[in-house]
């Protein structure tokens, strides 16, 4: 298992290591969404108070750093997941050809790759926060990433603890980093966390929803090996369960948008998500395992669209669009 495939050159090894991080797939890019959304929302709020307080270039720079930080940390987490799960992955049809499960990458190579990604992500966080509260934010996230693969073990299903919980927390938590990138020099960490609670809750519920749908693709193999996952709760009522889960993120979005109270975000975020998620549930077919993968992809597109929507809101606040509209209406 731990012997690398013979005659694999440096370029082949690099590609295999990138595969352990999932950088060649879209999934890791989910992890930057909470941080980037929070960066833009915090920036828009600050511009709403004083349009000259920040430049758009500064906000984009901080959002870019958050993107790189989250991606590197996710890459390290994915490599760690494959290290821990390599024996399980080798027995699952969808995962048996992963580099560690198939023996194409050694444990030493994977550990070095994981460590390099982790410390680069720490360096990015240092740049984002200007040296403040780095390990205060990094350690809880590190702990959740290390714990995640173990929550797939059947013992946790007995206490109704599922890996989707930790995944949701890990993907939502970087919202604090994003907000702190804008206001970290002005607000104490406790206040920043309070601002980010609605975003963290949204991403937590959202992640539990789309990851439960995605995990349903492996339900046949997972049941054979008694793998723990949230869809176990649903049994044969998986569609109804997903419908319930899909409502939870929709209930949290208004708490985020109301802080800015932007008509643009009510339409581009709240309305768009509502229509999309209703369509996802309507089109889901529990007899076609691949339909869970479709929900996962559709929500990735929703996340990307929300980044665009928040970027537009930053621009609208910078030019005082809503103040001008309000003044025009009063005339």
Curated annotation (Swiss-Prot):
Disulfide bonds: none annotated. GO terms for biological process: mycophenolic acid biosynthetic process; terpenoid biosynthetic process. Keywords: Golgi apparatus, Magnesium, Membrane, Transferase, Transmembrane, Transmembrane helix. It is found in: Golgi apparatus membrane. It is a multi-pass membrane protein. Gene3D superfamilies: UbiA prenyltransferase. GO terms for molecular function: polyketide synthase activity; prenyltransferase activity. Pathway: Secondary metabolite biosynthesis; terpenoid biosynthesis. It is an enzyme of class 2 (transferase). Its EC number is 2.5.1.-. It holds the Pfam family UbiA. Its cofactor is Mg(2+). It catalyses: 5,7-dihydroxy-4-methylphthalide + (2E,6E)-farnesyl diphosphate = 4-farnesyl-3,5-dihydroxy-6-methylphthalide + diphosphate. The keyword Isomerase does not apply. GO terms for cellular component: Golgi apparatus; Golgi membrane; plasma membrane. The chain crosses the membrane at residues 27-47, 56-76, 127-147, 159-179, 190-210, 240-260, 264-284, 295-315. Polyprenyl transferase; part of the gene cluster that mediates the biosynthesis of mycophenolic acid (MPA), the first isolated antibiotic natural product in the world obtained from a culture of Penicillium brevicompactum in 1893. MpaA' is a Golgi apparatus-associated enzyme that catalyzes the prenylation of 5,7-dihydroxy-4,6-dimethylphthalide (DHMP) to yield farnesyl-DHMP (FDHMP). The first step of the pathway is the synthesis of 5-methylorsellinic acid (5MOA) by the cytosolic polyketide synthase mpaC. Belongs to the UbiA prenyltransferase family. This is Polyprenyl transferase mpaA'. It comes from Penicillium brevicompactum.
């Amino acid at each position: 298992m731990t012997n690398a495939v013979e005659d694999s050159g440096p370029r082949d090894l690099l590609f295999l290591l990138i595969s352990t991080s999932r950088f060649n797939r879209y999934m890791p890019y989910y992890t930057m969404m909470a941080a980037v959304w929070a960066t833009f929302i915090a920036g828009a709020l600050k511009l709403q108070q004083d349009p000259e307080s920040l430049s758009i270039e500064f906000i984009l720079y901080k959002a870019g750093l958050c993107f790189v930080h989250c991606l590197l940390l996710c890459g390290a987490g994915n490599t760690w997941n494959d290290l821990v799960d390599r024996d399980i992955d080798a027995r699952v049809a969808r995962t048996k050809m992963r580099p560690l499960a198939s023996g194409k990458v050694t444990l030493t190579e994977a550990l070095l790759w994981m460590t390099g990604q982790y410390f680069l992500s720490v360096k990015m966080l240092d740049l984002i926060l200007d040296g403040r509260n780095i390990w205060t934010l990094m350690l809880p996230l590190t702990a959740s990433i290390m714990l995640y693969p173990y929550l797939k073990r059947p013992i946790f299903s007995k206490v109704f603890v599922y890996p989707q919980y930790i995944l949701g927390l890990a993907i939502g938590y970087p919202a604090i980093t994003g907000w702190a990138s804008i206001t970290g020099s002005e607000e104490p960490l406790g206040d920043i966390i309070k601002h980010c609670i609605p975003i963290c809750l949204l991403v937590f519920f959202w992640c539990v929803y789309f990851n439960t749908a995605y995990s349903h693709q492996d339900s046949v193999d997972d049941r054979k090996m008694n793998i723990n996952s949230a869809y176990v709760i649903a049994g044969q009522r998986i569609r109804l369960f997903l419908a319930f889960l899909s409502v939870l993120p929709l209930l949290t979005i208004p708490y985020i948008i109301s802080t800015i109270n932007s008509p643009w975000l009510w339409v581009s975020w709240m309305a768009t998500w509502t229509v999309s998620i209703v369509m996802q549930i309507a089109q889901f077919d529990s007899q076609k395992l691949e339909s869970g993968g479709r929900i996962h992809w559709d929500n990735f597109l929703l996340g990307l669209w929300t980044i665009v929507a928040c970027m537009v809101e930053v621009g609208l606040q910078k030019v005082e669009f809503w103040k001008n509209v309000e003044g025009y209406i009063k005339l």
